[in-house]
Amino acid sequence: MDAMGSAAEEGTQKKKRRPLVPPPPRPPRALFCLGLQNPFRKFCINIVEWKPFEMIILLTIFANCVALAIFLPMPEDDTNSTNSVLEKVEYIFLFIFTIESFLKIVAYGFILHTDAYLRNGWNILDFTIVSVGVFSVLLEQISKLQGLPAPGKSSGFNVKALRAFRVLRPLRLVSGVPSLQVVLNSIIKAMIPLLHIALLVLFMIIIYAIVGLELFSGKMHKTCYFKDTDITATVDNEKPAPCSSTGQGRQCSINGSECRGWWPGPNNGITHFDNFGFAMLTVYQCITMEGWTEVLYWVNDAIGNEWPWIYFVSLILLGSFFVLNLVLGVLSGEFTKEREKAKSRGAFQMLREQQAMDEDLRGYLDWITHAEVMDPDMEPRDGFSQLEEGGSETDSLYEIEGINKFIAFFRQWRLWHRLLRRKSRDLVKSRFFYWLVIIIILLNTVIIATEHHHQPDSLTKAQDIANEVLLALFTMEMIVKIYALGFQSYFMSLFNRFDSFVVCTGLLEVMLVASDIMSPLGISVLRCIRLLRIFKITRYWTSLNNLVASLLNSVRSIASLLLLLFLFMIIFALLGMQMFGGKFDFEDLEVRRSTFDTFPQALITVFQILTGEDWTAVMYNGIMAYGGPTYSGMSVCIYFIILFVCGNYILLNVFLAIAVDNLAEAENLTSAQKAKAEERKRKKLARANPDKTEEEKLLLAKKEQKAKGEGIPTTARLKIDEFESNVNEIKDPYPSADFPGDDEEEEPEIPISPRPRPLAELQLKEKAVPMPEASSFFIFSPTNKIRVLCHRIINATTFTNFILLFILLSSISLAAEDPIQPESFRNKVLSKLDIVFTVIFTTEIVLKMTAYGAFLHKGSFCRNSFNILDLSVVGVSLISMGIESSAISVVKILRVLRVLRPLRAINRAKGLKHVVQCLFVAIKTIGNIVLVTTLLQFMFSCIGVQLFKGKFYSCTDTTKITADECRGYFFVAKDGNPAHMEAVPRVWSHSDFHFDNVLSGMMSLFTISTFEGWPQLLYRAIDSHAEDMGPIYNYRIEIAVFFIVYIILIAFFMMNIFVGFVIVTFQEQGEQEYKDCELDKNQRQCVQYALKARPLRRYIPKNPHQYKIWYVVTSSYFEYLMFFLITLNTISLGMQHYGQTAEFSYMSDILNVAFTGIFTVEMFLKLAAFKAKGYFGDPWNVFDFLIVIGSVIDVILSEIDTPGIPATPGAEESSRISITFFRLFRVLRLVKLLSRGEGVRTLLWTFIKSFQALPYVALLIVMLFFIYAVIGMQVFGKIALVDGTHINRNSNFQTFPQAVLLLFRCATGEAWQEILLACSYGKLCDPMSDFQPGEEYTCGTSFAYFYFISFYMLCAFLIINLFVAVIMDNFDYLTRDWSILGPHHLDEFKRIWAEYDPEAKGRIKHLDVVTLLRRIQPPLGFGKFCPHRVACKRLVSMNMPLNSDGTVTFNATLFSLVRTALKIKTEGNFEQSNEELRMIIKKIWKRTSMKLLDQVIPPIGDDEVTVGKFYAIFLIQEHFRKFKKRQEEYYGYRPKKNANNVEIQAGLRTIEEEEGEGELQRAISGDLTPEEELERAMVEAAIEEGIYRRTGGLFGQEDSFHTGPVSPLHTITSQRPLRFSEAGSEDLDSPVFLPEPVFFPPPRRNRNTNNSTISRGLDQRLTTPDFERVQQSEEQWDTNSSISQATN
C-alpha cells in the first residue's frame, strides 16, 4: 500500500509542478508604497488576473465600437436625441476603462519595473486613450463652468480632435487574438526594410516633384472662358481643362470662347505643380496609378503633347511597377519567416506536451504496477460472485425458447441489411455514381445559366420543373449516401456537410414558396450555391485537389488577416465619421455617394479607398470640406495617404504574400505525392517482373519522345502534374533534339528561364542544322548543288541578321500607316514597300523549304511550330496582296493579321524564344487556377443575375421611375450652377455593365475584379429596386455585401493567388536549369560575383601638391560638406513657387549660380586630384561632370534670356523648352545623394541588377504593345475624336505613339473599361475617313471586348508579374537573415581591397589579409572584435594559394571567403570536393578561363603552398610555446638555452635541406622580409584595433621578440609534410627542437612605407622592459584559457 500511495503522490506532485500558464511576474512594490502582501494590491491582482474580467473588458470595447458606429455625424455640429444619449453613455465607458487602467497599475506597478504596466505597447495605447478621454471631459466641464457656449467650433474643436482618439479602442481586440498577432508581427518586423523602400519612394517623389515644379509650374491656370464672362466654356460631360493661347497646347474651339488666366486649376486648384507641397501630392497620386492620365492630359493641354509623357511614363514605370513592388517582395519574405517561426514554436509546444503526457503515463503505470502486487488478496470474492450469477441463469432457461424465433428472424434481417449496405457503399464509391452526380450537377449548372432578363414563360416553367426534379435527385443521392456510410462517416466529410446543407435549404425553399410564405427570390440565391458542388470534380484530379487544399489552407491564415483588415477599416471608418461626417455637401448640387455620413456608408468608402478606385476623388472632397487648397484643407490629405499606404500597399500585399507562401507549399505537396506514386509504381513493376526494370528505365525517354508540338522543349510538354513533380524526378530537362520536328534545328543548350542569363554566358555558337536525308519537293536530293547552296545561305549569320533587319523595317512600316485615309500618299508608298518585304520573306521561306523539305519527312520545314507561324504570316501577306479591294472585310482582317510579323523575330532571337516557352509553361500550369477562378466567377455571376436582372435601368430625370414616365423635357442646373438652368430631354437608359444574363454578369464582374469603376456599379446595385424600374436612393444598402465578398474572394484572394502562381512558376522554371548543380541561388550568385569581380583601381598621386588635393577630396569631411551642400541646394529648389516675388526669383537665381560655382569647383578639384583617367573611371563622376556642364549652360542661358528681347511666339516657346530642359540639371544633383546611404546604395545596386535580368522580358512586352497598338490603329483608328467621351484629343488610336500611350494607360488599369465601351460598335466616324453616306455611326466594333480583355489579362496578370517575379527574386536579400552572406555584401570587399592594392594589380601581401578581413564586417569579414587567434584559425580553413612572392590574389581570396562563409563543398575529402566544385563551375559558367579556375581552386597534384598551411604552422608553433611554458611551470625551472636548440619555426624545408647535415641553411622567398616583419605586422594590426592588450599580439605570446636572435623565415618550395633533422629530437616527445642555422641574411628594407614607420616605433617599444612585463603577465593570463586547445 505504501508503494501505491507514494506512486500516487508522485503523480500528483508532478501535476503540481507543471502550471500551464505562468502568471506574469509582479514587482515587489507598486507605486513606491504597496507591497505584495498589501490586501488592496492583492485584491487588484486577483481581479486583473481573473478570466471573466478580461472578457468583460473585451465586451465593453465591442460595445463601445457599436456606440461609436451608431453615432450620426451632422453638418454644423447639429445633434439629435440618439447622439445625446450616446454622449452620456460615453462617460460610462470612460469610467470602466479608467478603473481597468487603475487596477492594472496597482497590480503591476506603473513604469519603473521591467514588467510594469507601461512597459507593454498595448497598455501604452490604453493609457493614452484613457488619459485623453479624461482630459477632454475635464476641458468640457471647464468650458461649461466658464459659461462659454456649448463646445462648438471655436473652443470645442480641440475636444472633438481629442475625441477622435476613442476610435483606436478596437485595436485592443488584437491583443486578445493570437493569430492576429502573427500577421501583425510579420508586418511590424517588415517595417525596417519597408522604411528603406519608403525612403526610396520619398526620394523619387521629391525628385519628380522638383522636376515637375521646374517644368510645369504655373502652367495650369488658363482655361477657356466665354468672352467677357466668368463662365468656363466646356462640352457636355467634360471637366474644364487648361489651354494655351500660343504654341502646342489646346486651343479653345467653342465659338465665342477665349483662353484666359486666373482659373484656380483642375480639381478646384488642388492638382498642380505650383509649389513643392502640391507637386508632391500630385506626384504621389500618379504613383498610385489612380488619375495619373488626367494629370498627363491636363499638362498636354497646357503645354503640348510632345514630351510630357516621358515624365509621367517614367514615373509610373519606376515608381509603380518597380519601387512599389518592392513592398510586396519585403512583405512576402517577412511573412514566410514569421510563419516558419510560428510553426517551430508550435512544434516545440507539441513536444513539451508530449513529454508531459509521457511523464503522466509513467506515473500512472507505476501506480498500476504497484497496485497489481496487492491484487491476489481480492481473488476469492470474485469467484464467489461468479457462483451467484450462475445460479440466477438456470432460472431463466425456459423464457429463452420463446425469444429464439425472434432472434433468428432478426439475424436474417440484419444479414440482408448488411449486404444491402455493402452493395450501396460500393455503388456510392464507384466511378459510375461519381460521374452520374457530376452530370446532374452540370445539368443543374446549365439550367441556372439559362436564366436571363425578359425570358419567355415557357423557359421559366421548364426551369422550375427541372429544379424540382434535380432537387429530388440530389435528395435521393443524400439519402443513399447516409444509408451507405452511416451518419457519422457521412458527416465527417466537409463536402457532405455542405451538400446536406444545400439540399435541406432547397427543400425548405420549395416548401416556403409552395405555401406562399416568402417570395421565390430570397432563397433562389441558395440555388446558385449548389454550383459549388462542381468542386467535387477535384476528387480525382490530384493537382486541382492540392490546389483547393492549399486555398483552404490559406483561407485559415487569411481569416486572421481579414479580421485585421476589418478592424483597420472600422477604425478608419469611425475616424472618417468624426472628421468628415455630414461635411460632403457643397454648393454645386451634385450628389456625392462616397461619404462618411453613416457607419455602413463610411465602411464602404474606406473599402473603396483600400481598393484604390477613385480614392483621389474622395480625397478632393475631403480637402474641399475643410476649405479647399488652403493650409487647413491640405492637412486632411494625411488621413487619406495613411489609409491608402497602410491599406492598399501593406495589408493587401500581405494577401499576396500569404498566397505565394501557401502556393509554394501546395507545389511541394503535389511533387511529394507524385514522387511517392512513382516509387510505388516502380516497386510494383520490379515485383511483377524483375527483368523488366531495364525497360522501365526507358519509359520516361519514350514518354518524352511521344510528346507532340514542336519547338517547345519537352519539359514544357509533359503533363502539368509531371511538370509540377519535376522537382522530385530526375529527368533530363533538355533532351538533345530527340523528338520529331526539332531535330533539324539542333539547339545550343539554353535552359528555359524567365530571366535568361546574359547571352555571353549561353554559348550561342549556332551549329548549322544538318539537312534531312530525304529529297525535298521530290526533286532535290541531299547532294543537289542548289539545295546545298540554299542550306549554306540559310545558315549564314549574315542572312539571319538580314532577315531580322527586314522584320524590323516591315514592323516600322506597319506602324507608320495612316488608319484614317487608306488612299493617302503615305499609305501608297508603304504598300509598295510591303510588296518588297513580302517578296523577301517569301524568298526566305522558299529557300528554307528547298533546304529542309516541306513537311512529308522528319525534320522538314513545317514540322516546327515556329516555322508554321512564319509561313502563316507570309501567307497572309501574299493573300492580301492578291485581293486588292479593301471593301471586303476578309481583306481587312488579313491586313490586321500582318501585325504578327514581329513574332517571326522570336524564332531568330534565342533568348526571346525561351522567354516565350517559359510563358507557355506558366500558362499551362496556371490552368488549374483559371479553372477555379472561372467557376467562382460563374457562380457569382449566377447570383448576380438572380439579384439584379433587369434592375439597372434608369431615367436621366431621377424623379421618374418607369419607362412610361420618362418622356419629355426637364430642367438641369448647368455646371452645377443654380443660376443657369437649361431644358434637357428625358432618356430611359440601361447601364453599360449589368446582370441581365450570365455572360454580361461575368463581364461586369471581371471589370469589378480589376478594381475599375466598381463604386458606380455598387451604388447602381444599392439603388436597384425592381425589374424594369428606375433606382431609389440607397434602397438596400445591404446588397453591398455581395460586392465586397466578391472583391475579397476574387480580386484580393484569387487574383493574388493567380499572380502568386505566375511568380512561383517562374521562379521554379528559373531554378529548373540548375537543379543538378548542387548550388542554391544565393551560392551561385556569390560564386559568380567572386569569379567575375575585378579589383578597383585606387589612384594615389605621387606629386606632393596633387597629393594634398587628393587627400582633401577623398576625406570624409569633404564628402559630408558636399552632402550638406546638395541638401541645401534641394531645399532652395523646393522653395520656389508660382507667383513668387521678383526679389525671391532674383535670390534663387543668385543661389543657383552659387551652387553651380561650388559644384564646378568640386569637379575641378577632383579632376586635379585623380587626373582625367582616374576621374572618368567612376560612373558617379561622369554623372557629376554631365550635371555640372548642364548647370553651367543653364546659368548662361538664363543670363542671356532677358525679358527685353522681342521674339516671335514660336521661337519664344522653343527657347523656353530648351531652357527648362537645362533646368533639369539643377534637380539631378539630388541623385548624387543616392550614392551616399549604405542601405539605399544596396537597393540601387540590386535595382540595376534586376534591370539586367529584364531585357528579354522587356522585349516581349514591347512586342506585345506593338502588335496590339497596330491592331488598334487598324480597327479603332477611324473613330471620331469627341471631347467629353473617352476617345478624344488625348486618348485615341489615330497615330502609333497615341495608340501605345493609350495601351499603356490600359495596362495601368486607368478606366480601361470606359475605353472599351468607347471603342465598341456604333460610334461616330472621323470626318476625314472613308465612310459611305448614312454610315456615320458605324465605326468601332464588338471585337473591342476581346481586344481589351485579352490585352488587360496579358498585361496585368502575366507581363507585369514578370516584373514582380524578377524583383522578388533579386530583392529577397531585404528580408533574408543578414548573417547569411549574399552578393550584396561583396562590394565592401572590393572597396577595402583597393586600399591595400591601389594599383589594382590583384595581389596583396598575405600578412595584410588578416587586417583586411578584420576591417570588413561579418558575414564576409571577421569584424574588428574578432580575436587574432580566431582570425588565424579562419584563415587556415580558407586556405588560399600563396604565390612565390608571398602574395595572395584577389579572386582567390574572395572566392575562398565566399566558399567558407556559405560552406560550399567544405566537408569531406578536401581534394575530392575541390574537383567536384571545379566540375560544377565548368558546368554552370562555361566561359570561365582555366587560368582563373586554377587560381581559385588549384587542381589535384598541384604542389602549391597555401595560406592555410602557413598559418597552421604558426598555430602549431604557438601551441608548442604554450606547452613548453606549462612544463616550466610544472617542473618549476626554466630550461637553459642550448646552443643547439632553437624553437620550432614556421616554414617548409626543401628536400636538400632536410637531408643536409646538422646545419640548415634557409633562404628567403620572393618579396618577404624575415619573420620579424610578420610578427610586427600582426602587432601593428592589433595596436591599430586597440586590441593588443587583450589578445596578446598575434598568437597570444610574443616569445620570439625577446628570446635569442631574430629568427629566420622559411623558403617556399615543396608541399612535403614537415620533417625535421634528427638532432635533438630526444629532448621532447612531440615537438622537436631544430639546430640553429649559422647563416642569416640581413633584413631587407621594407618597401611598404606605411609599415616601416610604424615598425621603427615598434622596434623601440619592443625593447623596453615595460613591454616585457606586459608580455609576461599576458602570457600567464592566457595560459589557462588555452590548456584545452593545447591538449587537443
From Swiss-Prot:
Q: Name one GO cellular component term.
A: voltage-gated calcium channel complex
Give the span(s) annotated as Dihydropyridine binding: 986-1075, 1324-1390
Q: Where are the III repeats?
A: 784-1066
IV repeats at which positions? 1103-1371
Q: How is it modified after translation?
A: Phosphorylation by PKA stimulates the calcium channel function.
Which residues, renumbered to this chain, are glycosylated?
80, 255
UniProt keyword Zinc-finger present = no
Instruction: List keywords of the entry alphabetically.
Output: Calcium, Calcium channel, Calcium transport, Disulfide bond, Glycoprotein, Ion channel, Ion transport, Membrane, Metal-binding, Phosphoprotein, Repeat, Transmembrane, Transmembrane helix, Transport, Voltage-gated channel
The positions annotated for binding Ca(2+) are 290, 613, 1012
Which stretches are Cytoplasmic in the membrane topology?
Answer: 1-51, 109-120, 178-196, 333-431, 486-493, 542-560, 661-797, 853-864, 910-928, 1064-1116, 1171-1178, 1238-1256, 1369-1688
Instruction: Give a single Pfam family match.
Output: Ion_trans
Where expressed (tissues)? Skeletal muscle specific.
Report what the protein is called: Voltage-dependent L-type calcium channel subunit alpha-1S
Species: Aquarana catesbeiana
